[in-house]
Amino acid sequence: SLTPYIQSAELDWQVPKGSWKVLFFVCAKDGDPNADYLDPEAVKLFVKETHQAYYDRFADDFGDAIIETFFDEPTMYRAEGRMWTDKFNEKFRVRYGHSPELLYPALWYDIGEETQSARNRLFGLRATLYAEGFMKTIQEWASAHGIYSTGHQDQEEIQNPVSVAGDLMLCGKYMDIPGIDKIG
């Protein structure tokens, strides 16, 4: 990692002999108005503004007329399949015991023998953060309010859901009534 060589937003590094490709990765906001689905605290704020507002107004109907909460097509793809969170590196270190910084090129390039393992760890953690950050947070809120959680992911029919929902089975683990969208 060249991070120690960055001072005042400038890279001060003596390039060793050889052929080099320097890659710079940042976690940037892209203007998407959705909550950070990978961050349970952000999702809790979303739930406070939405679900809790309904509960505050219709608490007597929860568990009777209102038996479930429903979400429709949350997705990581709105960020062109690159949804990330600024807490990712920290959570990666906790889970795997090292920084993910040197693995990021594997998202776009073959980095050698470790390419597949790096992708599995990076995308695997992102899938876990998504399922636990969004689905689990919604499910816990619903359970605490006497209703079920249900809904469905965006594009659950595609063969490779990594950029959309991460891991569909993991998402379903945190839904009381997992759903799919069958149109047509």
Show the residue positions of the predicted features.
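Mature extracytoplasmic enzyme cores
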Residues: S1-N120, A127-L129
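Weak global preference for isoleucine
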Residues: I6, V15, I66-F70, I111, ...
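Generic recognition of flexible, low-complexity loop/linker segments
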Residues: L11-D12, Y55-F58, K136-E140, A165-M169
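Secondary-structure transition/capping motifs at alpha-helix termini
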Residues: A59-D61, Q139-Y148, L170-M175
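Aromatic-lined carbohydrate-recognition surfaces of secreted/lumenal glycan-active proteins
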Residues: I67-E73, R126-V164
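Substrate-binding cleft/loops of secretory-pathway carbohydrate-active enzymes
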Residues: P74-K87, T150-G184
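Short, basic, glycine/proline-bearing loop/turn elements
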Residues: R121-L125, I180-D181
